[in-house]
Design a protein with these regions (language model features):
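Short catalytic/metal-binding and nucleic-acid-binding patches
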Residues: 1-204
């Protein structure tokens, strides 16, 4: 079974022999950067012209179809999502900063050095949909047709604000008293501690 390390910080996975691995198993190392540019939003149901540039920060939000609780936390799903996120990030050289998965949506803040954000989002959500449907024993679409939000973050203050918003989402929604009490994926602890999250390819 392949495995990889996902560091919830400014990260990348170096491709072996200069190539992007399809199923990577190398170590993700830390990296810092700053992105600039106007805020944008992308609706998955409408094809809108948008400018994709390298060296940009983004916040990604996507909701489940009909806001169903298909991302509800349990050990199997948490491991599944972390692995899919790590694989997609390595494939498109996206630097994952923080991800918080609620029961019917996720918020993920990333840094895109190469302008691969669209391909990353498509690949990530396809992987998560296939694996989650297999886990849940369902065949219908997982994601809402209208709910891919991709917001470019202009400066470090914007990045910090979105990190706080994403990390504290379970508390804001009144589900837990403290961030660390949320049983779902929330990589704030790894970001603050600077440690890697070990992920292993699930059977799904």
């Amino acid at each position: 079974r392949g495995s990889l390390r996902l560091l919830s910080g400014f990260v990348r996975n170096p491709a072996k022999n200069g190539r992007r691995p399809d199923i990577p198993d190398s170590t993700i190392v830390s990296r810092r950067g700053v992105g600039v540019g106007p805020a944008i939003a992308h609706n998955a149901s409408v094809s809108l012209p948008r400018q994709i540039l390298p060296n940009q920060f983004y916040m990604i939000t996507r909701r489940c179809t009909q806001r169903m609780m298909l991302l509800r936390p349990d050990a199997e799903f948490n491991a599944l999502f972390e692995y899919c996120l790590a694989v997609a990030a390595a494939r498109y050289e996206i630097l994952v900063i923080l991800s918080c998965v609620m029961s019917n949506h996720h918020h993920t803040v990333v840094f895109d050095p190469h302008g691969n954000i669209s391909e990353f989002c498509e690949y990530l959500h396809r992987l998560v949909a296939k694996a989650t449907n297999a886990l849940r024993g369902r065949r219908e679409n997982l994601w809402s047709s209208e709910a891919l939000s991709l917001v470019r973050l202009v400066d470090p203050e914007d990045v910090l604000a979105k990190l706080v918003y994403a990390a504290t989402n379970p508390v804001k929604d009144g589900l837990v008293a403290k961030v660390e009490d949320w049983p779902g994926v929330n990589t704030l602890g790894a970001l603050l501690d600077g440690h890697a999250i070990e992920t292993t390819r699930p059977k799904y």
